[in-house]
Amino acid sequence: MKSGIHPDYVETTVLCGCGASFTTRSTKQSGQITVEVCSQCHPFYTGKQKILDSGGRVARFEKRYGKRKTTADK
């Protein structure tokens, strides 16, 4: 392996949207990474089902289509 061609590997803090944080190592020089979902709030790991609404898309969908009656209800 050639020496001097690999980036530095620094200690990095990962900050989640849920407020959790943990420390890992990365080549990103800022020392901080921001993520929307981590293992402490992801439904697969927590066993809870919740809707992750980014940008209000789910609310907009429910506003448009959520209260419509089906043909069987008429």
Swiss-Prot record:
GO terms for cellular component: ribonucleoprotein complex; ribosome. It comes from the Bacteria. It holds the Pfam family Ribosomal_L31. Keywords: Metal-binding, Ribonucleoprotein, Ribosomal protein, RNA-binding, rRNA-binding, Zinc. GO terms for molecular function: metal ion binding; rRNA binding; structural constituent of ribosome. GO terms for biological process: translation. Its cofactor is Zn(2+). Belongs to the bacterial ribosomal protein bL31 family. Type A subfamily. This is Large ribosomal subunit protein bL31. The lineage of its organism: Bacteria, Bacillati, Actinomycetota, Actinomycetes, Mycobacteriales.
